[in-house]
């Protein structure tokens, strides 16, 4: 399962990010364009966009974000025939064709998380996700709650949740022999660690994610496919 959450040392804001939202509603024109873009990329690779549901998740669905927080799109497949090989193929596609694109007029980059078969959006809340927007219903699955972004000590589960998702993404790619894509994901995690440490020091989301990947054996698997771990 994949879920991206807030860096808990990001400032707590009075509103959701108004570069991304109109009040508490995601900016429809921008997201409609991006969802159409996802659909076209899927079509080019033999996937039907209508077989999937799409959700806005992560730190931008909370009151705790920064100007560089990712725009996280969780992708849930509705087909029983969607297996781990299909999922790995789709993860590779989003890594190469969708991840890293900027949300218009911001420093926010898109990041896409393809969920395993059988996982629905409600399963993600058990990993620490706090809010999500349903693009199918144009409504909140669970609304943002500013009170949940106040106590830094209680936010640590969000770091671990993000580490779980990075690990899942990397290991899925390794299992599918998509080694270069797995290495690309490592480079993203490494760069994020460096950037977070410059701003926040060792007690930062990027550093905790990096240590999680080391502790749970993901880095050992990356070393086995030739990735140098810094």
Segments from the language model and where they lie:
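Catalytic core of pol beta-like nucleotidyltransferases
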Residues: 3-69, 76-230
